[in-house]
């Protein structure tokens, strides 16, 4: 059984950047009474059946992930670092009092979701990828703040195009609110960390307010250390001539109130393979002026250069080379590994288990039956 080619009727050059119809998603259910997960089931619908009093809707008991799949020139489909995303997902679930999804189940659901939607993985020569969105939430009906009787884990997928590509980021330091408390939920991937940011980022993007493309968050206690961008980690590079060293110094801004960035970890590993010096540490806001290049690093953005960070209260403008040699080398290497163009010496990519999870005879067309469910055996 061969992997389907990209959907012949899909408008790859003009598709919606928000949501596009695909074949369906994967679901499985955890029962607190038995402390066990059901087998994955493929649901040919984009919708969930959820009671309005579910804790995931009322009390924010939910966590999510984001990872990518790419099509190679030989029509293989590679999923990038799914085991690492599984580990981060388990951490996020534990923070909001949910049962962690075992790695084997997480991987099975991810592979099934991609396999059953394989024709929606963009062509190899296209700039996009398939974005994979695992989600877990408390799903049983209840009013009280008790442990739910039921949790739902699901995996959705979407063809995805980088919205900004290599366009340099212009960021504003967020000074009017704190994204995360020092000992709060900032280091896990939960919706409550992102919803409050939206009105502030929308306001910052207005032309009359400077037209900033992103917010940079700082620590809530001292307002002086970098946490992260709203949806990406911050990495800075000092060139050898700045530090009188033989190699560049790559610094990842570390914060206990920011999520562990798998993309940043990948960039660090690549930089180390180049022989560069790597640091993971607290970065003071004022230290930004010492970097020659700064990147926003995350799943959706991969690596995006930053040209300017503005600290409004002090009037400081931190400027950086926006298309520098360090960015170019790191981005080309990471992108090449993800697309199968460069040897994956780090063993990050998993080949899609299509023989195991693909469905024979599928015609590649989104179904009109939103109730059809395909069960996988226990």
UniProtKB/Swiss-Prot annotation:
The keyword Nucleus does not apply. Keywords: Aminotransferase, Pyridoxal phosphate, Transferase. Pyridoxal 5'-phosphate binds at residues 88, 228. The modification N6-(pyridoxal phosphate)lysine is found at residue 189. GO terms for molecular function: branched-chain-amino-acid transaminase activity. It holds the Pfam family Aminotran_4. Apicidin F, like the other known apicidins, is a cyclic tetrapeptides with anti-malarial properties via histone deacetylase inhibitory activity. Aminotransferase; part of the gene cluster that mediates the biosynthesis of the cyclic tetrapeptide apicidin F (APF). The non-ribosomal peptide synthetase apf1 incorporates four different amino acids to produce apicidin F: L-phenylalanine, D-pipecolic acid (D-pip), N-methoxy-L-tryptophan and L-2-aminooctanedioic acid. L-Phenylalanine is the only proteinogenic amino acid directly used by apf1. The 3 other apf1 substrates are non-proteinogenic and have to be modified by other enzymes of the cluster. Belongs to the class-IV pyridoxal-phosphate-dependent aminotransferase family. This is Aminotransferase apf4. It comes from Gibberella fujikuroi (strain CBS 195.34 / IMI 58289 / NRRL A-6831). The lineage of its organism: Eukaryota, Fungi, Dikarya, Ascomycota, Pezizomycotina.
């Amino acid at each position: 059984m061969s992997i389907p080619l990209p959907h012949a009727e899909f408008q790859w050059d003009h598709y919606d950047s928000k949501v596009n119809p695909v074949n369906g998603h994967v679901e499985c259910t955890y029962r607190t009474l038995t402390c066990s997960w059901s087998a994955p089931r493929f649901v040919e619908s984009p919708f969930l059946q959820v009671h309005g009093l579910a804790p995931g809707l009322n009390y924010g008991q939910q966590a999510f992930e984001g990872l990518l799949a790419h099509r190679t020139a030989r029509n293989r489909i590679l999923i990038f670092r799914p085991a690492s995303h599984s580990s981060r997902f388990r951490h996020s679930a534990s923070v909001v009092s949910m049962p962690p999804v075992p790695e084997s189940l997480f991987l099975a659901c991810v592979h099934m979701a991609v396999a059953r939607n394989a024709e929606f993985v963009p062509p190899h020569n296209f700039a996009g990828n398939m974005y994979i969105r695992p989600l877990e939430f408390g799903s049983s009906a209840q009013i009280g703040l008790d442990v739910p009787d039921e949790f739902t884990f699901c995996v959705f997928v979407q063809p995805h195009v980088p919205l900004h590509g290599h366009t340099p980021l212009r960021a504003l330091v967020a000074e009017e609110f704190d994204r995360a408390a020092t000992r709060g939920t900032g280091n896990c991937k939960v919706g409550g960390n992102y919803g409050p940011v939206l009105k502030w980022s929308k306001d910052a993007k207005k032309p009359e307010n400077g037209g900033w493309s992103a917010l940079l968050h700082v620590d809530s206690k001292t307002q002086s250390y970098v946490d992260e961008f709203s949806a990406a980690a911050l990495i800075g590079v000092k060139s050898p001539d700045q530090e009188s060293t033989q190699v560049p110094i790559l610094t990842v801004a570390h914060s206990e109130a920011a999520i562990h960035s798998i993309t940043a970890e990948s960039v660090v590993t690549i930089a180390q393979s180049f022989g560069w010096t790597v640091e993971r540490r607290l970065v003071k806001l004022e230290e930004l002026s010492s970097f020659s290049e700064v990147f926003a690093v995350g799943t959706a953005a991969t690596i995006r250069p930053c040209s300017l960070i503005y600290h409004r209260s002090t009037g400081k403008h931190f400027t950086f080379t926006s298309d520098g040699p360090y960015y170019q080398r790191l981005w080309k290497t990471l992108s090449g590994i993800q697309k199968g163009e460069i040897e994956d010496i780090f063993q990050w990519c998993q080949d899609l288990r299509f023989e195991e999870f693909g469905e024979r005879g599928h015609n590649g067309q989104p179904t009109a039956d939103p109730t059809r469910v395909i069960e996988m055996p226990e």
